[in-house]
Amino acid sequence: MERQVLLSEPQEAAALYRGLSRQPSLSAACLGPEVTTQYGGLYRTVHTEWTQRDLERMENIRFCRQYLVFHDGDSVVFAGPAGNSVETRGELLSRESPSGTMKAVLRKAGGTVSGEEKQFLEVWEKNRKLKSFNLSALEKHGPVYEDDCFGCLSWSHSETHLLYVAEKKRPKAESFFQTKALDISASDDEMARPKKPDQAIKGDQFVFYEDWGETMVSKSIPVLCVLDIDSGNISVLEGVPENVSPGQAFWAPGDTGVVFVGWWHEPFRLGIRYCTNRRSALYYVDLSGGKCELLSDGSLAICSPRLSPDQCRIVYLQYPCLAPHHQCSQLCLYDWYTKVTSVVVDIVPRQLGESFSGIYCSLLPLGCWSADSQRVVFDSAQRSRQDLFAVDTQTGSITSLTAAGSAGSWKLLTIDKDLMVAQFSTPSLPPSLKVGFLPPPGKEQSVSWVSLEEAEPIPGIHWGVRVLHPPPDQENVQYADLDFEAILLQPSNPPDKTQVPMVVMPHGGPHSSFVTAWMLFPAMLCKMGFAVLLVNYRGSTGFGQDSILSLPGNVGHQDVKDVQFAVEQVLQEEHFDARRVALMGGSHGGFLSCHLIGQYPETYSACIARNPVINIASMMGSTDIPDWCMVETGFPYSNSCLPDLNVWEEMLDKSPIKYIPQVKTPVLLMLGQEDRRVPFKQGMEYYRALKARNVPVRLLLYPKSNHALSEVEAESDSFMNAVLWLHTHLGS
């Protein structure tokens, strides 16, 4: 039997972390053009991009690796790597041209200070760099957006132009008392006159530019930019409505214009990261006349428009606006030539039996269409696993491509000419890279997957999914008969199960979910001898829209009781050590952790909370998501809303700060000083309240970290401190 790492051995825990943190994560994949060999065979290259933690450099490194896939048109004959991995430094975005003969790369270079960094747009062809444009020196716009909310890098169908999104060039500003430099080369008559630089606006040095919140702090006014590759000329497109911010753009059929998503930014911007409910619509701007046309319903929220291979139709995801941040979405289809919009897949109120429970992905892959432009492939959470699906856009029929396969979760990276590139993982298996052809309509369940990169299972981890039904007194009257699930990881064959401690992890959001995929922290804790319980309480995504809608107005109550019920059920059935149960959660998971130690103080011996929501009322005026505070408390949100005393009272009543007098569990707080989502003063408020009551508490403040605490230095330090906290308060 494999030896478990004991709680009393932090050095071994550090060594274990060093080993498991080397597991890389897939971030992107693209398929090269189809090549015919001299013998008539067909093959394609698969270019993959990965990220990996580097503890020596304390950063996430990026690298690429290529593979060859030989096929006969509808099945893979042979597949394997074509060389070793190579680190890619400075690449922000890259995109193959439609023919596959060229590649565009957005690269940063220069100093480590942000003001010294320059951005270059490169065009590569075969074995040479064909063009390189210093975008920073050209001064047509500000920094290019490389994020997946607004950012894009799109080739025109003619492969002569590149489309991207950048920050609008800001006017120069100066003090009212700015001294002008004199031109010493001028004539005597000109000596007394100052030089004439670009006209600067006096007194605008400190004008506030509102940004898009968490992880988007430097992004305020995006503009659409077009680079003419031959001439090097850059144009900032006119015609975009003044009240929207453009992004996720691509070329319209025939290169006649540009299609983009426009997000409303009036009267002010709300945080957009992790929020699919921001009011937005699909637009088309004509390049010849600059006329802009609205293509979708302007009262909703949309994202991920994707043009079909035949350039006739566009699919996109559509959500209700200013409601819960993430919900079940519609898949909509816009016909370019008839101008008709239809709903292909509608919102699913609740899952019936083993049927489809709805679409919950926040983005469609850039490549998601079948070769015949009839079907769309995507991944989505279905209860506590993530599967791949194909939907027929004509009939709306949905078929799972992976439900009949191994337990675990899938992610679609791309599909092109029906060749799919996907990732598969489980809680005990790091990500594997697989390829397979999309079968003909009606036979979608018969995909034959071939591994390009197979990961080794992590021994010593046993996992499963528990279905839980709330007791009658905890039913939601409006949304009755909802169940929920929890994923349980536990050490394989422990010497004495009654001595196994348990860490309970509720997820954040609250409208997100855990799926049966690889996660570093739960795997690490399980290897150290803990059972780990990941709870998808009612309100989680993947269980139908009714489950999501059951939670707003009931936070701090329904979700808390669901987690506690799951804990009690698992302790009763598995006989783990009930005296050694700990909580670990971030954001809304931290909110629940702090609630649980206040409402059920006898159950938990330690608590670790990362950037937790502590006081909804005090967070309302400082967060980038004030709508969250209103909606989750149970009130409608509008940009002009002013909470009254009743609203403030409800916010306090649903906050963990209410239960401070009952708390006796030792608490470790981990806060990111740059967190715009749940400002670190939330955790400070809890810290001071606990200190005043002599409850054991420790606070770690990471000065350069934001809400996710995902930087390598913060993540590694927070994990080791969590291990030490568990060792101290649970014992070995």
From Swiss-Prot:
The active site is at S587, D675, H707. The modification N-acetylmethionine is found at M1. It is found in: Cytoplasm. Its EC number is 3.4.19.1. One of its GO terms (cellular component) is cytoplasm. Keywords: Acetylation, Cytoplasm, Hydrolase, Phosphoprotein. One of its GO terms (biological process) is amyloid-beta metabolic process. One of its GO terms (molecular function) is omega peptidase activity. The modification Phosphoserine is found at S185, S187. The modification Blocked amino end (Met) is found at M1. This enzyme catalyzes the hydrolysis of the N-terminal peptide bond of an N-acetylated peptide to generate an N-acetylated amino acid and a peptide with a free N-terminus. It preferentially cleaves off Ac-Ala, Ac-Met and Ac-Ser. Also, involved in the degradation of oxidized and glycated proteins. This is Acylamino-acid-releasing enzyme. It comes from Rattus norvegicus (Rat). The lineage of its organism: Eukaryota, Metazoa, Chordata, Craniata, Vertebrata. The gene is Apeh.
